[in-house]
Amino acid sequence: DSPAWLKSMERIFQSEERECRWMFGGCTTDSDCCEHLGCRWEKPSWCAWDGTVRK
């Protein structure tokens, strides 16, 4: 069994989200952009609001 401190570290790394691009940040796909943003396909590509809102 793992020590308590190791288990807490595992939880921290599992819950950590990947870095994302903010509004107007450069992108190549929608997954590059933060939540509620999508990659605008016209060049130059940048993250723009996808029209959704948080509930």
From Swiss-Prot:
UniProt keyword annotation of Disulfide bond present: yes
Cysteine disulfide links: C20-C34, C27-C39, C33-C47
Distribution of this protein across tissues and organs: Expressed by the venom gland.
Pfam families documented for this protein: Toxin_12
InterPro entries per record: Huwentoxin-1
Transcription as UniProt keyword: no
Prodomain positions: 1-19
GO CC, any one term: extracellular region
Molecular function in Gene Ontology: ion channel inhibitor activity; toxin activity
Cellular compartment(s): Secreted
Top-level taxon in the UniProt lineage: Eukaryota
Primary localization class, coarse: secreted
Segments forming a coiled coil: none
Keywords from the named record: Disulfide bond, Ion channel impairing toxin, Knottin, Secreted, Toxin
Domain writeup: The presence of a 'disulfide through disulfide knot' structurally defines this protein as a knottin.
Family: Belongs to the neurotoxin 10 (Hwtx-1) family. 06 (F4b) subfamily.
Described purpose of this protein according to its UniProt entry: Probable ion channel inhibitor.
Record protein name field: U2-theraphotoxin-Cg1a
Organism: Chilobrachys guangxiensis (Chinese earth tiger tarantula)
High-level lineage: Eukaryota, Metazoa, Ecdysozoa, Arthropoda, Chelicerata
